[in-house]
């Protein structure tokens, strides 16, 4: 009997996964492809019941070894249909995942924040397998985090008691957990690179500025988004919160206690009544706000107080085509073109969109018609060729570019120039390459390019738009270059691409950038300078900023002083 028990103990010991001590207790992970993986480690108490719509609270210590061997809940999205696609969706979701090499000591850390418009997405959708094979194998540790989304993450009354930004506070708590515990996993707490894409990138931008987090990282990677945009500063979030509370029969102000008692089913029913998108250029119903706490000022002002640290900023050459021509992201943005709508896009179509979705609520007041004509002239009339074989393709492309500039290109360029003016070392790239399989046959050739989310195929092996064969060229070397770029930056603070002398941006008025094309890479200049100049001049002239309405007051006062 004694021999049998000893045998059982020895067998169990042989099958036990890697165990690491944290500040709250031990966690047991799994091994995969030469890496050690720890899944769904809690970094905060479940934000349920009395903790709903509150800042995250540190978890209670645990005595037994915590089984960090499988994913648990994704955070509740903003819309019931999205939640139904996830087998594991719920409020108890504040966990993070760590993927590390087996042998690790003082390794750099990539702290990944997923995108999804602050309303959908999860850490689990990225998996751990590719991170283990392509990142941990090259001597970096990856931490992927979850944060509250949609109404659970960003409900706000615009008061100190119900300020919103719960999702950003979750990210801050996760970052603090990693910084305090990563040394036990073989990581260097002084070499944490915060990294995100889309809303995850806007989050990274916000973390670099917030007094809660700006001293907790060493480098930042911001891909295809910026906090310098209205959809990341929530001009309508308080009004959206008020509408939701009223539909649910909760008092306003003072809705928090009533809202805490509402079930997810009741809230989803109310969202169905309210609608899950704004239908305007502000795009998101739920997003961060300028709360005077996490975000004490508008990002364009707050960045002046942020520390100077190496920053890598990237984008695609046709960001808006993801939402327009490809008709994707419909659960968060309402700008898509169906195959039936595509042939109808012309100057009149674009003009109607400008009036209804950009200049709604009489934006620009008595100058609204002039601004309307200025935008139409810049995006359609000035560039319209005298003779063109595919006029519809021209209009579809211009429609996509209008969305690209307002929601991505111009705010990203503004952030780049603001950081460079502060002497921050900023490396910039633009992704022009795309695999032809991501584009459907009905989409005009002129409107095609590298859309938003294109890098997901290469950085994470995630087939967002189509399955791409990464064994063929040029996709194989582009994938290698992008991953090497991220890893070298995390290790040294300088992104490195073989055979390319890539320097930080030196002139904010003529941004130099790495262009990643199908036929190679090269250093070029003048990144989206014309639309940047157009929107900056319009803001200065009118005292209102369509790119980020929360930033208008500052420029209105500047206008008055001139």
UniProtKB/Swiss-Prot annotation:
Enzyme class: hydrolase
SUPFAM superfamilies: alpha/beta-Hydrolases
Coiled coil stretches, renumbered: none
Main location: endoplasmic reticulum
One Pfam family this sequence matches: COesterase
Segment forming the signal sequence: 1-16
Localization annotation: Endoplasmic reticulum lumen
Keyword Hydrolase on entry: yes
Source taxon at top rank: Eukaryota
Catalytic activity: a carboxylic ester + H2O = an alcohol + a carboxylate + H(+)
Gene Ontology terms: cellular component: endoplasmic reticulum lumen; peroxisome
Motif (Prevents secretion from ER): 559-562
Carbohydrate attachment residues: 73
Any one biological process term the GO annotation gives: cellular catabolic process
Catalytic residues identified in the record: 198, 319, 452
Annotated S-S bridges: 75-93, 250-258
EC number, UniProt record: 3.1.1.1
Any one GO molecular-function label of the UniProt entry: carboxylesterase activity
Tissue expr: Expressed only in the intestine.
Family according to the record: Belongs to the type-B carboxylesterase/lipase family.
Name this protein carries in UniProt: Gut esterase 1
Lineage start: Eukaryota, Metazoa, Ecdysozoa, Nematoda, Chromadorea
């Amino acid at each position: 009997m004694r021999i049998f028990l000893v045998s059982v103990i020895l067998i169990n010991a042989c099958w036990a996964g890697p165990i690491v001590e944290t500040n709250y207790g031990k966690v047991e992970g799994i091994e995969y492809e030469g890496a050690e993986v720890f899944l769904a480690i809690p970094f905060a108490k479940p934000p349920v019941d009395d903790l709903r719509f509150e800042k995250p609270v540190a978890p209670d210590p645990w005595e037994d070894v915590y089984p960090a061997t499988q994913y648990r809940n994704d955070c509740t999205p903003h819309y019931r249909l999205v939640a139904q696609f996830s087998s594991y969706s719920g409020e108890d979701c504040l966990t993070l995942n760590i993927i590390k090499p087996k042998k690790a000591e003082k390794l750099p850390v990539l702290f990944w924040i997923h995108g999804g418009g602050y309303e959908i997405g999860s850490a689990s959708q990225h998996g751990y397998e590719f991170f283990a094979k392509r990142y941990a194998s090259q001597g970096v540790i990856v931490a992927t985090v979850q944060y509250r989304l949609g109404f659970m993450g960003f409900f706000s009354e615009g008061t100190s008691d119900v300020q919103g930004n719960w999702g950003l506070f979750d990210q801050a708590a996760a970052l603090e957990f990693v910084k305090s515990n990563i040394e036990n996993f073989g990581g260097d707490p002084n070499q944490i690179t915060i990294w995100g894409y889309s809303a995850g990138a806007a989050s990274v931008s916000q973390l670099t500025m917030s007094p809660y987090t700006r001293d907790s990282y060493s480098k930042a990677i911001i891909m295809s988004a910026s906090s310098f945009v209205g959809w990341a500063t929530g001009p309508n979030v308080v009004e959206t919160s008020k509408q939701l509370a009223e539909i649910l029969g909760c008092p306003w102000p003072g809705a928090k206690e009533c809202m805490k008692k509402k079930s997810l089913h009741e809230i989803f029913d109310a969202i169905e009544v309210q609608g899950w998108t704004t239908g305007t250029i502000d795009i998101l119903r739920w997003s961060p706000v300028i709360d005077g706490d996490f975000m004490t000022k508008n990002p364009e002002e707050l960045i002046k107080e942020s520390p100077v640290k190496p920053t890598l900023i990237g984008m695609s050459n046709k960001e808006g085509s993801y939402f327009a021509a490809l008709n994707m992201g419909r659960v968060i943005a309402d700008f898509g073109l169906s195959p039936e709508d595509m042939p109808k896009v012309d100057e009149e179509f674009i003009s109607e969109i400008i009036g209804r979705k950009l200049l709604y609520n009489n934006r620009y007041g008595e100058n609204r018609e002039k601004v309307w004509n200025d935008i139409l002239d810049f995006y359609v009339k000035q560039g319209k060729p005298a003779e063109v074989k595919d006029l519809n393709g021209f209009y579809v492309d211009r429609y996509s570019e209008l969305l690209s500039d307002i929601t991505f290109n111009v705010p990203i360029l503004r952030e780049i120039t603001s950081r460079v003016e502060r002497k921050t070392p900023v490396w910039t790239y633009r992704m022009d390459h795309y695999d032809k399989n991501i584009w459907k046959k009905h989409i005009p050739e002129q409107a095609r390019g590298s859309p938003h989310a294109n890098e997901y195929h290469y950085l994470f092996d995630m087939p967002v738009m189509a399955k791409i064969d990464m064994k063929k060229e040029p996709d194989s070397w582009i994938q290698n270059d992008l991953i090497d770029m991220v890893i070298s930056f995390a290790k040294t603070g300088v992104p490195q691409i073989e055979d390319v002398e890539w320097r930080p941006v030196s002139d904010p008025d003529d941004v130099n950038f790495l262009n990643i094309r199908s036929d190679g890479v090269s250093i070029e200049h003048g990144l989206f300078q014309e639309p940047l100049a157009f929107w900056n001049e319009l803001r200065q002239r009118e005292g209102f900023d369509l790119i980020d309405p929360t930033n208008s007051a500052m420029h209105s006062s500047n206008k008055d002083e001139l």
